[in-house]
Amino acid sequence: MSIDSVIDAWNQADPAAIHPTRGISEDAYRISGENQAALLSTILPAGCKVVDFGCGDGRVAIPLAGLGYEVTAADGSQVMLDRLTEAAPDVPTVLTDGTDLADQLGRKTDAVISLAVLIHHSYESAERIIEGLRAAVRVNGLLVLDWPVADEPAEGAGWISVTTWSRDRQDELCQRIGLKRLDQAGSPWPIFRAVKAG
């Protein structure tokens, strides 16, 4: 699917369908975001500038800001950003599909997180997004990406299906754009340091 097709699907999605915990209850949804923000706080430097790309309606961005991080919430869906702003008007938002994140921010950031986003995109689209996310992060900054590897990688067929990658394909992209894989140290998501490309 194209990036625009995925964004259109999110724009039309019922709020109850955007995360499995929301189908349980709003409290479960909120707690899942708080738990992930707490886990991210063990990875990210305290108080750093962090962009939550694919922030949706703020499930992780809002509690991360509550932990003292300087959070910018970024998403390709204005519908999602409007919901976030309604819940947390003090969290700045940026409308972007990720490919132009650096231009939309107008600055480099210390870190980018992107959870449950790349899995919804084709290889080609995800590569373009990851390139855009990397371009927005200062050298030595961090990227925490929900970017799964599988023994039998497969490209998802629709916006709700999951794309998985081979480690070799990930490593080739990382080498080309300047990402160094770090020890995950108990993180469920791969962690990368922004380095000079090549």
Outline where the language-model segments fall.
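Class I (Rossmann-like) S-adenosyl-L-methionine-dependent methyltransferase catalytic domain
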Residues: 1-47, 57-103, 121-128, 132, ...
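Local beta-strand N-terminus motif with an aromatic residue
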Residues: 47, 109-110
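Conserved beta-strand/loop positions that form the S-adenosyl-L-methionine
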Residues: 53
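Short alpha-helical donor nucleotide-sugar binding micro-motif in glycosyltransferases
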Residues: 106
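A conserved beta-strand element that flanks and buttresses the S-adenosyl-L-methionine
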Residues: 113
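Short catalytic micro-motifs in class I SAM-dependent methyltransferases
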Residues: 116-117
